[in-house]
């Protein structure tokens, strides 16, 4: 191993190496130029030959051109190194910085996904805790319910009791309605069965409508009206429809006092002549 002198700096060594490389590149360029001139001479000599040979020579020249382009690239690189000795270090630093950034970008999604997983786990744990607390609180009310005495008697069914209660309520409502007022519809339903008509009913006329009454009703004052006219007479009163006035004598008429009558002719016995 050859020792380098102490006075020589590393920058000087780098410059010397670069110069040696440049000299080798220049020699290669000169050799390539000589080869190009030779190929040109060969092309001129072989112009009258077959086209295949021409194609082959052109292909070789294309390869030489690529080598020339490579040499130009090497020259540009060496010149850049001579101008800026610390460029290699800078490029290496830039490459390392880019690599670090890429690694950071790749690590960030992994970290975010990990955070999302932890958040979902925490939410699920909180939900389970709430459910457990609710289930723990619900049994506290059960002893009070168990301690309450049963309202139903032993040996009876709850459904039967509810049915009986509703039936009693319906009966009470019906009785109250009957006591408070008797509607016209109920009265008409009671008198649907029309009595048999006799000759006198056909001859009698209602003093209001002047028609023979299908159902004759008599008031306390002794006047007879047909059923529709009597109800209209009572309902047209101005005293809250509690009672009406007779159309003939203006006496008070209550529906509860009205009577259903059957009109008949007086039967007169005929004397038999002897």
From Swiss-Prot:
Where on the chain is Phosphothreonine found, per UniProt?
Answer: 66
Q: Where is this region: Disordered?
A: 1-117, 136-159
> Has keyword Metal-binding?
yes
Q: What is its EC number?
A: 2.3.2.27
What effect does gene inactivation have here? Leads to the persistence of YEN1 foci.
InterPro entries named in the record: SLX8 (IPR049627), Znf_C3HC4_RING-type (IPR018957), Znf_RING (IPR001841), Znf_RING/FYVE/PHD (IPR013083), Znf_RING_CS (IPR017907)
* Keywords, in A-Z order: Centromere, Chromosome, DNA damage, DNA repair, Kinetochore, Metal-binding, Nucleus, Phosphoprotein, Transferase, Ubl conjugation pathway, Zinc, Zinc-finger
Q: Which GO terms describe its molecular function?
A: ubiquitin protein ligase activity; ubiquitin-protein transferase activity; zinc ion binding
**Zinc finger region(s), RING-type:** 206-250
The principal localisation class reads nucleus
Pathway(s) per entry: Protein modification; protein ubiquitination
> In what ranges is there compositional bias, type Basic and acidic residues?
13-28, 97-108
Domain of life of the organism in this record?
A: Eukaryota
Q: Which SUPFAM superfamilies match?
A: RING/U-box
Q: Which GO terms describe its cellular component?
A: cytoplasm; kinetochore; nucleus; SUMO-targeted ubiquitin ligase complex
Subcellular compartments: Nucleus; Chromosome, Centromere, Kinetochore
**Biased segments, Acidic residues type:** 66-75
A GO BP entry is: protein sumoylation
Reaction equation(s) it catalyzes: S-ubiquitinyl-[E2 ubiquitin-conjugating enzyme]-L-cysteine + [acceptor protein]-L-lysine = [E2 ubiquitin-conjugating enzyme]-L-cysteine + N(6)-ubiquitinyl-[acceptor protein]-L-lysine
**What is known about what this protein does?**
Component of the SUMO-targeted ubiquitin ligase (STUbL) complex SLX5/SLX8 that mediates ubiquitination and subsequent desumoylation of sumoylated proteins and proteins containing SUMO-like domains for their degradation. The STUbL complex SLX5/SLX8 stimulates ubiquitin conjugating enzymes, including UBC1, UBC4, UBC5 and UBC13-MMS2, and mediates the proteolytic down-regulation of sumoylated proteins. The STUbL complex SLX5/SLX8 is involved in ubiquitin-mediated degradation of histone variant CSE4, preventing mislocalization to euchromatin.
Under the subunit heading, UniProt states: Component of the heterodimeric SUMO-targeted ubiquitin ligase (STUbL) complex composed of SLX5 and SLX8.
* Protein name, UniProt field: E3 ubiquitin-protein ligase complex SLX5-SLX8 subunit SLX8
The opening ranks of the lineage are: Eukaryota, Fungi, Dikarya, Ascomycota, Saccharomycotina
């Amino acid at each position: 191993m050859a020792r380098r002198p102490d006075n020589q700096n590393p920058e000087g060594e780098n410059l010397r190496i670069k110069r040696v490389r440049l000299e080798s590149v220049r020699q290669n360029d000169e050799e390539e130029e000589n080869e190009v001139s030779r190929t040109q001479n060969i092309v001129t000599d072989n112009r009258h030959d077959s086209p295949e040979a021409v194609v082959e020579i052109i292909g070789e020249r294309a390869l030489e051109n690529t080598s020339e382009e490579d040499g130009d690239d090497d020259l540009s690189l060496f010149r850049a190194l001579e101008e800026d000795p610390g460029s290699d270090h800078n490029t290496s630093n830039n490459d390392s910085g880019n690599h670090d950034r890429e690694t950071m970008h790749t690590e960030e999604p992994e970290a975010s996904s990990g955070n999302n997983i932890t958040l979902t786990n925490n939410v699920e744990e909180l939900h389970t805790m709430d459910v457990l607390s609710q289930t723990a609180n619900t049994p506290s009310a059960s002893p009070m319910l168990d301690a309450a005495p049963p309202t139903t008697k032993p040996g009876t069914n709850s459904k039967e009791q509810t049915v009986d209660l509703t039936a009693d309520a319906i009966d009470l409502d019906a009785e109250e309605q009957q006591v408070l007022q008797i509607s016209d519809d109920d009265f008409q339903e009671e008198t649907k069965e029309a009595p048999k008509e006799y000759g006198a009913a056909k001859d009698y006329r209602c003093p209001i409508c002047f028609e023979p009454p299908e159902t004759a009703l008599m008031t306390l004052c002794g006047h007879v009206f047909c059923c529709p006219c009597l109800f209209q007479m009572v309902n047209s009163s101005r005293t809250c429809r509690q009672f009406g006035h007779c159309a003939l004598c203006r006496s008070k008429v209550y529906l509860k006092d009205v009577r259903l009558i059957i009109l008949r002719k007086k039967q007169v016995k005929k004397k038999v002549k002897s």
